Curated annotation (Swiss-Prot):
This is Protein OS-9. Its main location: endoplasmic reticulum. InterPro entries: Man6P_isomerase_rcpt-bd_dom_sf (IPR009011), MRH_dom (IPR044865), OS-9-like (IPR045149), OS9-like_dom (IPR012913). GO terms for cellular component: endoplasmic reticulum lumen; Hrd1p ubiquitin ligase complex.
Length: 666
């Protein structure tokens, strides 16, 4: 809005300059209203001054701002040659004339338009009526705005001289001798203007607007696609605004002082640049001379240090690997039964860091827990002594069990089982924590998953073997019952599942997320909770409401358009088309208010939006969704530069000033 106000004010000054004497303006100009109706202009106030009075061209005009700053503005070349080009334009059209193009409207239905209280009815070539409607019925008198009298003749020489219709690109008809006007006592009259609208081919002809410039004198604008084939009525191609360039006009002494200041400023910049370059060269030369000798002296020690570190790094892994292989060999000798067992061996990637123990009895489980406790308290010797303990403690416990001859064997096993259950509840967390810490420090998520599956399968097989061996050793009636056997299996399986579940939950979320990203496993998309019948179409939802005064007290009521209304579907289609064409998604909420008077009657009897409103919505959506932010940014920057240049006042040498910001108002 500020740019438009500035443009109009400067154009006013520009046109006043056209009327000034020739010795002030440097040329003679004339105000061409036809040019203003056809062309668009954009004012540009440049910061580069010129010497005033030097240009004698006819396309230069001198104007003055409110701050008394004079400008020389040069009209664009298109404005100079506008009149000649328009006269030389000869459209090569061999089709039907304008009356023939509009003749089908005679047999078409009359056009209706409701504006405020009144409804207007236009019947081509017959008459124009005005009346009030309530509940689809005419209430009160019917006024005639006029009967058909004549149409504009495009071949008449007098009509050609006016060029009004040619410039505004419309065809007109005259309607007169209507109902008597109560204000001036004259019969009502109207002018009907037909304009090309290519979009009207789908919705049909329509009354765009009804104006009353004078009392009982009306102008109806009708949009139709029937006139678009004619070159004289087809809308011209939109072009960029013609720029009017305005330079500050200085007196000769002011201009010479300006040139001198520019030369001094340029010399100062060159001098500063040379000083900076000299300083950089000196600093670079000094640093290069000082840094060269140390580099030569340090070359050989650095290489020797790097080589020694490299050989140390190679020797350390070999020593570690040798120690690990020896430990593994000793463990395999002591646990030959475990090697012969069909349980799966751990992956080869973990043979240097992971030790796998087979738990074949509750006593082995207790010993493993004690070893882990000792490792936590800072006793690394527990793990080294483990193979020996395995061989010595097992016979001792068996001897103690056999020594108790007064008790049955089944009772001894039950008492041992109770003690083991109590110890298991206390030490389960400790065992699981140590196991998880070692896995987190040594394994990647993918390796953990593989190791976990193999350990789980091996433990399940070992549990099954333990149950089978126990059945053989115990009394035939001990666990032969199916119920007892199932209970034992469930107890062992639940413990195993609990350990595996806790292990899965304790994984680092970040590592799990990275592991999931690396895996390329196709997953089915989750089903939508509320499937729609046509998902792409229902991505965009448009809601149209209308405010209307009604009832005896003229209360304000709110009406909402029905979802089945075809006009609502058309609006949703326009929004979807804009979004798909620009590659945007329907996110967020946009509210657009169209302020217009509502019509009386029920919802189904009234039209919510005119055809023009529906067509304009597409442009509104495009401006909001696509061009809004970028264009607003550019316009804001251009406006700021324009105002800054306009406020600058060029005075005596060194005395430039700016206008008062409080007085300057766009």
């Amino acid at each position: 809005m500020a740019a438009e106000a500035l443009l109009s004010s400067l154009l006013g000054l520009l046109f006043l300059g056209l009327l000034l004497p020739a010795h002030l303006t440097g040329g003679v100009g004339s105000l061409n209203l036809e040019e203003l109706s056809e062309m668009r202009y954009g004012i540009q106030i440049l910061p580069l001054p010129v010497m005033g009075g030097q240009s004698q061209a006819s396309d230069v005009v001198v104007v003055s701002s409110k701050y008394k700053q004079r400008y020389e503005c040069r009209l664009p070349a298109g404005a100079i040659h506008f009149q000649r080009e328009r006269e030389e334009e000869t459209p090569a059209y061999q089709g039907p004339g304008i009356p023939e193009l509009l003749s089908p409207m005679r047999d078409a239905p009359c056009l209706l338009k409701t504006k405020d209280w009144w409804t207007y009815e236009f019947c081509y070539g017959r008459h124009i009526q005005q009346y009030h409607m309530e509940d689809s019925e005419i209430k009160g008198d019917v006024l005639y705005l006029g009967y058909y009298q004549s149409a504009f003749n495009w071949d008449d020489e007098t009509a050609k001289a006016s060029k009004q219709h040619r410039l505004k690109r419309y065809h007109s008809q005259t309607y007169g001798n209507g109902s008597k006007c109560d204000l001036n006592g004259k019969p009502r009259e109207a002018e009907v203007r037909f304009l090309c609208d290519e979009g009207a081919g789908i919705s049909g002809d329509y009354i765009d607007r009804v104006d009353e410039p004078f009392s009982c004198s009306y102008v109806l604008s009708i949009r139709t696609s029937r006139l678009c084939p004619h070159p004289l009525l087809r809308p011209p191609a939109s072009a960029a605004p013609q720029a009017i360039l305005c330079h500050p006009a200085l007196q000769p002494d002011e201009y010479m002082a300006y040139l001198q200041r520019q030369a001094e400023s340029k010399q100062h910049e060159e001098k500063v640049t040379e000083e900076v370059q000299d300083t950089d060269h000196q600093v670079w030369s000094g640093s290069k001379a000082a840094g060269a000798p140390p580099k030569k002296e340090d070359v050989s020690p650095t290489k020797e240090d790097k080589e020694s570190e490299f050989w140390k790094m190679l020797q350390e892994p070999e020593e570690q690997a040798t120690g690990t292989e020896e430990a593994q060999a000793g463990e395999q000798d002591l646990n030959h039964e475990a090697a012969a067992d069909p349980a799966p061996a751990p992956p080869t990637d973990f043979q240097n860091n992971v030790q796998v123990k087979l738990i074949r009895s509750p006593a082995d489980l207790i010993r493993l827990i004690e070893e882990l406790k000792g490792a936590e308290k800072g006793k690394p010797s527990v793990r080294q002594e483990q193979p020996g303990d395995d061989t010595t403690e097992a016979p001792q416990r068996e001897a103690e069990a056999k020594g108790k001859g007064g008790e049955p064997r089944g009772l001894v096993e039950e008492e041992d089982g109770d003690e083991e259950e109590e110890d298991e509840d206390e030490d389960e967390q400790q065992l699981l924590g140590e196991f998880e810490k070692e896995l987190e420090g040594m394994l990647l998520p993918s390796d953990r998953e593989r190791l976990r599956s193999e350990v789980k399968a091996g433990m399940e097989r070992e549990l099954e073997n333990i149950i089978q061996e126990t059945e053989k050793e115990l009394d035939p009636e001990g666990l032969r019952k199916e119920s007892e056997r199932e209970q034992a299996i469930l107890a062992l399986t639940s413990t195993l599942d609990k350990l595996i579940k806790r292990l899965q939950e304790s994984q680092s979320p970040e590592l799990v997320q990275k592991y999931k990203k690396r895996r390329v496993v196709p997953q089915k998309p989750p089903p939508s909770p509320h499937p729609t019948e046509e998902e792409p179409e229902h991505r965009v939802r448009v809601r149209v409401t209308k405010l209307r005064h009604g009832g005896p007290n003229q209360d304000l009521t709110v009406l909402e358009m029905n979802r089945e209304n075809p006009q609502l579907k058309q609006i949703e289609g326009l929004v979807t088309e804009v979004l798909e064409r620009e590659g945007l998604t329907a996110e967020g909420k946009i509210e657009i208010k169209i302020v217009r008077p509502g019509a009386e009657g029920k919802e189904e009897d009234t039209r919510w939006l005119t055809d023009e409103d529906t067509r304009n919505l597409k442009e509104i959506f495009f401006n909001i969704l696509v061009q809004g932010a970028e264009e607003a940014n550019k316009e804001r920057q251009r406006q700021s530069e324009l105002e800054s240049n306009y406020r600058r006042v060029w005075g005596s040498p060194g005395g430039e000033d700016t206008g008062d910001l409080d007085e300057f108002d766009f």
